[in-house]
From Swiss-Prot:
<feature type="region of interest" description="Disordered">
    <location>
        <begin position="303"/>
        <end position="347"/>
    </location>
</feature>
<feature type="modified residue" description="Phosphothreonine">
    <location>
        <position position="35"/>
    </location>
</feature>
<feature type="region of interest" description="Disordered">
    <location>
        <begin position="1"/>
        <end position="33"/>
    </location>
</feature>
<feature type="region of interest" description="Disordered">
    <location>
        <begin position="127"/>
        <end position="193"/>
    </location>
</feature>
<feature type="modified residue" description="Phosphoserine">
    <location>
        <position position="105"/>
    </location>
</feature>
<dbReference type="GO" id="GO:0031116">
    <property type="term" value="P:positive regulation of microtubule polymerization"/>
</dbReference>
<protein>
    <recommendedName>
        <fullName>Microtubule-associated protein Jupiter</fullName>
    </recommendedName>
</protein>
<feature type="modified residue" description="Phosphoserine">
    <location>
        <position position="24"/>
    </location>
</feature>
<dbReference type="GO" id="GO:0008017">
    <property type="term" value="F:microtubule binding"/>
</dbReference>
<comment type="function">
    <text>Binds to all microtubule populations.</text>
</comment>
<keyword id="KW-0493">Microtubule</keyword>
<keyword id="KW-0539">Nucleus</keyword>
<dbReference type="GO" id="GO:0005634">
    <property type="term" value="C:nucleus"/>
</dbReference>
<keyword id="KW-0963">Cytoplasm</keyword>
<dbReference type="GO" id="GO:0005819">
    <property type="term" value="C:spindle"/>
</dbReference>
<comment type="similarity">
    <text>Belongs to the MAP Jupiter family.</text>
</comment>
<dbReference type="GO" id="GO:0005200">
    <property type="term" value="F:structural constituent of cytoskeleton"/>
</dbReference>
C-alpha cells in the first residue's frame, strides 16, 4: 500500500481549471470585443460626401423575412441578406446629377448641336443617388446658374436693342403712309345670274299701293277690318261674343252699403276661454275634452303632499284614526299615507 502512494499529490498540479463555457465566457468577466457602433451624424451634409462601399439603404421593408434587392439593408440588429453583392459585388450605377431648373434651354449665339448634347447630359429625372460625380454635378449646377444669369441679362439687352432698333422703321413707315396714301381697292358687287329667283336678290324696301275696292278684308294699306279682329277673353256681345266693335256698355256697379259677411269680426272672447292647455294631460280644455284629450280635472294642491297635512277630508280619505270608546289602545286604520305622498299618480 505504501508503494502505491503517489508522492506528487502534495505538489501543485499543472492542470488549469477552465470555467464552464470556455475562457471567453461573460460570466467570469472577460472583456467584450470592442466593435464600433454605426452612429449616424444627421447634422452632417452629404452633398460633397465620398463614396460609400455599401449600397443605398432602404429601411422601409420591415423584418428579415422580406425580400432584399440590390442596395437594400435590413433593420438594425439583423444581418444583411444581399445575395447580389455576395456573388457579383457592388453593382455599378450610372451617374445621375441633379437637374438645374434655373438654367435656360434657349441657346443665344452658341452652337446648337453642342448645346443639345449638353442638355441631354444634364437632363435627368431630377434624382441623385449619392454616388461618384456629386462634386462635379454640384459645381456644374453652380456654374450653370451663373451662366443662366449672364445669358438672361444678355438676352434682355439683345431684346432691348432690337426694340430700340425697330423704332425708327415704324416712324419712317408712318411718314411714308401719310405722304403716299394707299389706293383704295375697288369693291366689286356680285351680279346675280339670269335664272335667279326674286328671293335670291338682296332685301329692299317695297312700297304697298292702294288696295282694290273689291277687297273687303283690307280697307287701307296695312290695316285690317276691326270686325275680323276678335279676342275671346274680352267680348261680351251675345250676337258677336268675340267682337270688339259691338260691345255692351259698362255695367252700373255700385259699392255695397254694408261690409261683406266675411269681414264681420267676432266679439272678443272671454279670458276664461283662452286659457293655455297642456296637450298631454288635457289641462286647459275647460272639462270638455275636445280632440279626444283627457278632460280637465281639478286638483286641490293645498297642504303637504308627503305628510298629507292640510288636505280636506273627502270620500276617499282614510287617514283618520278610529279611537275606541272602551278606554283601550286606539285602533289605527292601516290606510295611512301612501308611498310617495298624496301627489303620487298611484293614488
Amino acid at each position: 500500500m505504501i508503494s502505491n502512494f503517489d508522492c506528487t499529490d502534495n505538489q501543485a498540479s499543472s492542470k488549469v481549471l477552465r470555467p464552464p463555457g470556455g475562457g471567453s465566457s461573460d460570466i467570469f468577466g472577460s472583456e467584450m470585443p470592442q466593435t464600433p457602433r454605426n452612429v449616424k451624424n444627421r447634422m452632417a451634409s452629404n452633398i460633397f460626401a465620398a463614396e460609400k462601399d455599401n449600397g443605398v439603404k432602404n429601411n422601409v421593408r420591415q423584418g428579415a423575412h422580406r425580400f432584399y434587392f440590390i442596395g437594400d439593408a435590413p433593420r438594425r440588429g439583423q444581418k444583411t441578406v444581399d445575395s447580389h453583392n455576395r456573388l457579383f459585388g457592388e453593382p455599378a450605377r450610372p451617374i445621375t446629377p441633379g437637374k438645374n431648373h434655373m438654367k435656360s434651354s434657349i441657346p443665344f449665339g452658341q452652337n446648337t448641336e453642342a448645346v443639345a448634347s449638353a442638355q441631354k447630359l444634364l437632363t435627368t429625372n431630377g434624382h441623385y443617388n449619392g454616388k461618384s460625380g456629386s462634386v462635379s454635378s454640384a459645381s456644374s449646377s453652380v456654374s450653370s446658374s451663373t451662366e443662366n444669369l449672364k445669358m438672361n441679362s444678355g438676352s434682355r439687352s439683345v431684346f432691348r436693342n432690337m426694340s430700340t432698333a425697330a423704332g425708327p422703321d415704324t416712324k419712317e413707315t408712318s411718314q411714308r403712309e401719310s405722304l403716299c396714301p394707299p389706293s383704295p381697292v375697288p369693291i366689286e358687287v356680285p351680279t346675280p345670274p339670269a335664272d335667279s329667283l326674286p328671293i335670291d336678290n338682296s332685301c329692299r324696301d317695297s312700297e304697298v299701293g292702294d288696295v282694290p275696292a273689291d277687297n273687303s278684308t283690307y280697307t287701307k294699306s296695312d290695316q285690317v277690318n276691326e270686325a275680323c279682329q276678335t279676342r275671346r277673353d274680352s267680348g261680351n256681345n251675345p250676337e258677336l261674343p268675340y267682337s270688339l266693335d259691338q260691345m255692351a256698355g259698362v255695367a252700373n256697379v255700385k259699392e255695397p252699403l254694408g261690409l261683406c259677411p266675411n269681414e264681420v269680426k267676432e266679439d272678443a272672447q272671454a279670458c276664461s276661454k283662452l286659457d293655455s292647455r297642456n296637450p298631454i294631460t288635457g289641462l286647459g280644455l275647460n272639462g270638455d275634452g275636445v280632440g279626444g284629450l283627457k278632460p280637465k280635472k281639478l286638483k286641490i294642491r293645498e297642504g303637504n303632499p308627503v305628510t298629507g297635512e292640510g288636505y280636506k277630508a273627502g270620500g276617499n280619505d282614510f287617514h283618520h284614526r278610529q279611537e275606541s270608546n272602551n278606554g283601550g289602545t286606539p285602533v289605527i286604520n292601516k290606510n295611512r299615507i301612501p308611498p310617495g305622498g298624496y301627489s303620487s299618480g298611484l293614488w
